[in-house]
Curated annotation (Swiss-Prot):
Its EC number is 3.2.1.8. Endo-1,4-beta-xylanase involved in the hydrolysis of xylan, a major structural heterogeneous polysaccharide found in plant biomass representing the second most abundant polysaccharide in the biosphere, after cellulose. GO terms for molecular function: endo-1,4-beta-xylanase activity. Keywords: Carbohydrate metabolism, Glycosidase, Hydrolase, Polysaccharide degradation, Secreted, Signal, Xylan degradation. It comes from Talaromyces purpureogenus (Soft rot fungus). Pathway: Glycan degradation; xylan degradation. One of its GO terms (biological process) is xylan catabolic process. Residues 17-207 form the GH11 domain. The gene is xynB. This is Endo-1,4-beta-xylanase B. N-bromosuccinimide completely inhibits the catalytic activity. The keyword Secreted applies. The active site is at residues 101, 194. Pfam families: Glyco_hydro_11. It is found in: Secreted.
Length: 208
């Protein structure tokens, strides 16, 4: 193929696209479930969001930025996160069929979901320089992406929290797949903050 000067210039421009444009291309979904409870604010183009919540938060909220269709590609983030009650900083998403909700919990307040009496512990998985406790739980007739339904939750909870890094989510998907996770037909996938009690603040940048 003959490469014209105009095409070469376009190619060079594409290859040298600034980081903010790359963020815009990879981030195309805003998760905002009850975000008003956490004073949620965001800049989708810059890949940033923040929130704070106070004692007496009246309901669960889940907010974040990411992909409208999830994948097994790594996700990189950096955050300032502090929480005193029930809260997660996590890669969060859904699979359509079989319907499942998932969390790769990087940090949490005072509640580890794998410590729940209803959780089924599946062992550990090593990823990204750390060890994650893995468990599942079943939600019966609870809110979901299709309304009210019964579905499985998959959790990987990092032992020794972190608030920045790359999540090689394929490692978690592959482990979960041994226990019924669909590992395909993804719905949205975000870096999220969820909270339902206590107080906290978070400021997050998602870069991939």
């Amino acid at each position: 193929m003959k490469v014209t000067a105009a095409f070469a210039g376009l190619l060079a421009t594409t290859l040298a696209a600034p980081a903010t444009e790359l963020v815009t291309r990879s981030i195309n979904y805003v998760q905002n479930y009850n975000g008003n409870l956490g004073a949620f604010s965001y800049n989708e183009g810059a890949g940033t969001f923040s929130m704070y919540w106070q004692q007496g938060v009246s309901n669960d909220f889940v907010v974040g930025l990411g992909r409208s269709t999830g994948s097994s590609n790594p996700i990189t983030y950096s955050a300032s996160y502090s929480a005193s009650g029930g809260s997660y900083l996590a890669v969060y998403g859904w699979v359509n069929s079989p319907q499942a909700e998932y969390h790769v919990v990087e940090a949490y307040g005072n509640y580890n979901p794998c410590s729940s009496g209803s959780a089924t512990n599946l062992g550990t998985v090593s990823s990204d320089g750390g060890t994650y406790q893995v468990c599942t739980d079943t939600r019966v007739n609870q809110p979901s992406i299709t309304g009210t339904s019964t579905f499985t939750q998959f959790f990987s909870v990092r032992q020794g929290s972190r608030t920045s890094g790359t999540v090689t989510i394929a490692n978690h998907f592959n482990f979960w797949a041994k226990h019924g996770f669909g590992n395909s037909n993804f719905n949205y996938q975000v870096v999220a903050v969820e909270a339902w009690s206590g107080t906290g603040t978070a400021s997050v940048t998602v870069s991939a």
